[in-house]
């Protein structure tokens, strides 16, 4: 953690869209500024698997639907939990979510093979003349499909799109695609310039002028598209990332890793949602020792035995509760120390039931807008 932790201190104030300087910015412990920021077009929600990304992205989309003209919730997670979350079947076509007139959802295949017009086709002249490209740049075929997909998403007429992303590792691969495309297409463009004379001769010999021109057009189109996507990713007025985690070692570690990659790629990130947090009990404190003293004054053995059993169970529950609070506080303290000066950190409580269905997601979404102190345990 130490190396990544030391790198976090280098994150500049520019990560926040709302501040002119670190000193002047107050980082609220809610997502109000994210929801109220009407300039954003793309909001990515990511983190380790099983930390509540889908619940958080659905909740953000619901709140945005109250402020924006049209909202699309787009799942790139292979598990596609959005259908389960809303108890409604979604496909790779935008579908209106029940009870809304401006909130849509779609689930796309993360291989991108069925969701884009781009296909790697061996008979295609563009691909057959440069097979080395696909070997020299592993993942370029998926990156090209991703570029086509993002371009089609960019052309969608929604006010804002919320991306429910796959777990961290897959998300980092997606974030690397624009750089991979830039490198691969730069190689192609240089190759085209170097072989211009040879290709012209080939054109006259093979009578393939139209195919060569088509290849040039395709390279230029992909290059323009790649630059456009990267510019959109790196524009903090249009794109931001919301990190989701829970107060446990692996989740905090992956969050740190994700934030470092986002920082390296100049992608805005100024919100962290910490789910499954155990907050202090709101019920009145019960002094178990005092209860034990009072119990000794009761002469009835049956009542004493019943209360003794109850006190033992209470002690067990208290031990579990305190242990959990202490463990979580260790990681909440790390989160606060690492990111407290640069991020809106929103702690969400551990709930009694799973969050499924519109009513429960709506309630959860309201809680994202309520400020809550980071609950560090102290004896």
From Swiss-Prot:
Give the EC number(s) under which this enzyme is classified: 3.6.-.-
By its UniProt entry, which Pfam families does this protein fall under?
ArsA_ATPase
Location in the cell reads: Cytoplasm; Endoplasmic reticulum
* GO MF entries: ATP binding; ATP hydrolysis activity
* Entry-linked PANTHER family: ARSENICAL PUMP-DRIVING ATPASE ARSENITE-TRANSLOCATING ATPASE (PTHR10803), ATPASE GET3 (PTHR10803:SF3)
The protein's job, in short, is: ATPase required for the post-translational delivery of tail-anchored (TA) proteins to the endoplasmic reticulum. Recognizes and selectively binds the transmembrane domain of TA proteins in the cytosol. This complex then targets to the endoplasmic reticulum by membrane-bound receptors, where the tail-anchored protein is released for insertion. This process is regulated by ATP binding and hydrolysis. ATP binding drives the homodimer towards the closed dimer state, facilitating recognition of newly synthesized TA membrane proteins. ATP hydrolysis is required for insertion.
Assembly and interaction partners? Homodimer.
Name assigned to this protein: ATPase ASNA1 homolog
């Amino acid at each position: 953690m130490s190396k990544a932790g030391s790198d976090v201190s280098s994150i500049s104030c520019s990560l926040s869209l709302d501040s002119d300087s670190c000193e002047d910015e107050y980082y609220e412990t809610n997502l109000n500024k994210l929801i109220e920021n009407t300039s954003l077009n793309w909001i990515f929600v990511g983190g380790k698997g099983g930390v509540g990304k889908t619940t958080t992205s659905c909740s953000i989309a619901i709140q945005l639907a109250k402020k924006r003209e049209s909202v699309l919730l787009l799942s790139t997670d292979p598990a596609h939990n959005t259908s389960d979350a809303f108890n409604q079947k979604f496909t790779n076509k935008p579908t209106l979510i029940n009870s809304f007139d401006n909130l849509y959802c779609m689930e796309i295949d993360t291989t991108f093979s069925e969701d884009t017009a781009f296909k790697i086709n061996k008979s295609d002249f563009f691909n057959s003349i440069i097979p080395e490209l696909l070997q020299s740049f592993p993942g370029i075929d998926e990156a090209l499909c991703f570029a086509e997909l993002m371009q089609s998403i960019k052309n969608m007429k929604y006010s804002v799109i919320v991306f429910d992303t796959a777990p961290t590792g897959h998300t980092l691969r997606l974030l690397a695609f624009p750089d991979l495309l830039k490198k691969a297409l730069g190689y192609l463009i240089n190759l085209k310039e170097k072989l211009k004379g040879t290709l012209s001769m080939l054109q006259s010999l093979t009578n393939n002028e139209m195919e060569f021109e088509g290849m040039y057009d395709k390279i230029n189109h992909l290059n323009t598209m790649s630059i456009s996507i990267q510019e959109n990713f790196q524009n903090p007025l249009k794109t931001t990332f919301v990190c989701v985690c829970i107060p446990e070692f692996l989740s905090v570690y992956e969050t740190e890793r994700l934030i470092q990659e986002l920082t390296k790629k100049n992608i805005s990130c100024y919100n962290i949602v910490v789910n499954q947090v155990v907050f202090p009990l709101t019920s009145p404190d019960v002094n178990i020792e005092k209860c034990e003293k009072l119990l000794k004054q009761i002469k009835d053995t049956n009542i004493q035995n019943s209360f003794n059993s109850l006190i033992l169970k209470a002690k067990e529950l208290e031990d579990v509760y305190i242990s959990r609070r202490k463990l979580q506080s260790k990681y909440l303290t790390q989160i606060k120390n690492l990111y407290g000066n640069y991020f809106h950190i929103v702690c969400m409580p551990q709930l009694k039931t799973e969050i499924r269905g519109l009513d429960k997601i709506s309630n959860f979404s309201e809680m994202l807008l309520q400020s809550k102190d980071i609950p560090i345990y102290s004896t």
